């Protein structure tokens, strides 16, 4: 289950929220009664929940405006089907010694284009190398160089939660998706939008 220290949503305190005349809700309290198809949607933030929504609704909304205070590191999930040996090991009774060996033997192979090692956690040079490799990927994924620059974090990898999500950066290439980048963040809500 998702119980624990992160199970209670932290609601933002943005001036004027009560004045907004449109539909609004927090991702932690998703309103399934609101149909977003064909609407102009604004998302405040680029954290984990926002990133999931951004990639999920971009194709169905008329316009999507993302309000970003700081960029986020995001990597594709690179999901693959579960190997048959692991499926068989689970069928035999959970996480066994044989399954641990299969995990170790078939674990993720190093990616030469993504130099992640445990040194990136405590070695500034290794972390900078990893950040450079991911920044290069962002520039390759995002068509507009200025937009790619805005989507590239200016802080070390692992300084904040890293997102593992497919198509995050490429979503910003869509003609209906717009990024508003302001280090001060959203300061208030009006009857018709944000400021």
At which residue positions do the language-model features occur?
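A conserved short coil-to-beta-strand element within the FAD-binding core of flavoproteins
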Residues: 30-33, 154-156, 176-195
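Short beta-strand to alpha-helix junction loop
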Residues: 121-130, 156-167
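Short, surface-exposed acidic
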Residues: 140-153
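Generic recognition of flexible, low-complexity loop/linker segments
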Residues: 53-54, 167-168, 191-193
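Short polybasic linear motifs
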Residues: 86-89, 169, 178
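Anion-binding catalytic surfaces of enzymes that hydrolyze or transfer phosphate/sulfate esters
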Residues: 148, 165, 180
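Rossmann-like dinucleotide-binding core of oxidoreductases
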Residues: 2-136, 140
């Amino acid at each position: 289950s998702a119980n624990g220290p992160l199970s209670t949503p932290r609601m933002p305190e943005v001036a004027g929220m009560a004045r907004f005349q449109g539909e609004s809700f927090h991702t932690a309290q998703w309103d399934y009664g609101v149909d977003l198809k064909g609407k102009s949607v604004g998302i405040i933030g680029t954290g984990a929940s926002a990133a999931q929504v951004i990639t999920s609704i971009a194709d169905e909304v008329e316009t999507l405006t993302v309000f970003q205070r700081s960029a986020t590191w995001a990597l594709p999930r690179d999901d693959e089907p579960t190997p048959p040996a692991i499926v068989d090991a689970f069928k035999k009774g959970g996480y066994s010694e044989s399954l641990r060996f299969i995990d170790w033997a078939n674990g993720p192979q190093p990616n030469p284009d993504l130099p992640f090692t445990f040194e990136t956690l405590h070695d500034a040079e290794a972390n900078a190398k990893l950040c450079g490799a991911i920044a290069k990927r962002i520039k390759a994924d995002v068509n507009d160089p200025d937009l790619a620059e805005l989507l590239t974090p200016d802080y070390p990898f692992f300084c904040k939660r890293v997102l593992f999500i497919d198509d995050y950066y490429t979503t910003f290439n869509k003609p209906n998706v717009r990024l508003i980048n302001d280090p001060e963040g959203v300061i208030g809500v009006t009857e018709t939008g944000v400021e």
